[in-house]
Design a protein with these regions (language model features):
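Repeated loop/turn-to-beta-strand initiation elements of outer-membrane beta-barrel proteins
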Residues: 70-75, 159-162, 198
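Outer-membrane beta-barrel pore domains and translocons
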Residues: 67, 78-80, 174-178, 205
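Extracytoplasmic gating/loop element in the C-terminal half of outer-membrane beta-barrel translocons
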Residues: 25, 80-169, 175
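Membrane-embedded beta-strand positions of outer-membrane beta-barrel proteins
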Residues: 75, 171-173, 202
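Flexible, surface-exposed loop regions and adjacent strand-edge segments
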Residues: 1-4, 90-99, 184-194
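Residues that define the transmembrane beta-barrel architecture of outer-membrane proteins
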Residues: 56-60, 143-148, 194-198
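Outer-membrane beta-barrel "beta-signal"
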Residues: 150, 154, 194-206
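Conserved small-residue
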Residues: 1-54
Length: 206
C-alpha cells in the first residue's frame, strides 16, 4: 500500500499516489501524470498527489427490529459512502503477482497481451518487479452496505407451554456477516481471518 503521508492542509487519511494516464493500447505501458501536469512513461514517487480519502462522507449503522406473533427479526447493518480505498488485492494479488506462483485468473485473462488491447492490467511480464509502484488506477470509491449480524427468533405462547412445565421458551438462530454489497471487490481476511458463523440458542424459563 502507499506510504502514509502528511501534508499541511490535507486530510490525515488522504491517499497519495501518482496519477495514472492509463495503459497505452499500442505498447501496453502505463503512462503517468507528473505534479506539473506533464505526461511521462517514467514512474517517479515524487509525483505523488492526493488521489482520494479513506474517510467516508457518510457512515453509520442501521439496527432494525421487526416482530410479529411471536416471531422477531433483528439486523445489525453498517454503511459507508463517499470515501476511497487503495485496492491492494488488485495491485498486489492481480497485477503485481509473481507469475511463477498460483495467481488470480484476472492476471492472465484481463492483462495487456497485444496491440489495441484495452485491459485493466499491465502485461504479466516482470509483474513481480513493480510492487513499489503506486498509481491512481487502484484507487476505488468505497460505497459499502453490509449486514453484520442477523437473528431470527420465536417465542412460544405461554399457554401452550404449561403442559410441559415451562413459563417461557424462546429459540433463535443467528449468523454473522451474511451479506455484503460493495463497489469494491477485494480479498477479505488478509490481516485477520475472516469467517462466517452460526449460533443456535434455546432459552427456557421454568
Amino acid at each position: 500500500a502507499p506510504k502514509v503521508l502528511y501534508q499541511e492542509g490535507e486530510s490525515e487519511t488522504a491517499i497519495y499516489a501518482v496519477r495514472s494516464a492509463g495503459i497505452n493500447p499500442a505498447t501496453g505501458e502505463e503512462g503517468f501524470i507528473k505534479k506539473n501536469g506533464a505526461y511521462t512513461l517514467v514512474y517517479d514517487s515524487n509525483d505523488k498527489v492526493v488521489v482520494g480519502d479513506e474517510t467516508p462522507v457518510l457512515e453509520g449503522a442501521i439496527l432494525p427490529m421487526l416482530s410479529y406473533k411471536g416471531w422477531s427479526l433483528n439486523l445489525s447493518m453498517m454503511y459507508r459512502f463517499g470515501g476511497q480505498v487503495y485496492n491492494l488485492t488488485r495491485a498486489i494479488n492481480v497485477e503485481n503477482v509473481n507469475p511463477r506462483h498460483n495467481v488470480d485468473r484476472r492476471a492472465f485473462d484481463e492483462r495487456w497481451k497485444k496491440v489495441n488491447d484495452i485491459p485493466p492490467y499491465l502485461d504479466i511480464a516482470n509483474a513481480d518487479s513493480r510492487t513499489s509502484i503506486h498509481t491512481s488506477r487502484f484507487v476505488e470509491d468505497d460505497n459499502t452496505l453490509e449486514v453484520k449480524t442477523i437473528t431470527v427468533a420465536y417465542e412460544f405462547n405461554p399457554e401452550l407451554l404449561k403442559s410441559i412445565g415451562f413459563k417461557r421458551l424462546r429459540v433463535s438462530v443467528g449468523m454473522n456477516d451474511p451479506f455484503r454489497l460493495s463497489t469494491i471487490k477485494y480479498e477479505r481476511g488478509t490481516s485477520y481471518p475472516f469467517s462466517r458463523g452460526f449460533v443456535f440458542s434455546i432459552s427456557p424459563t421454568f
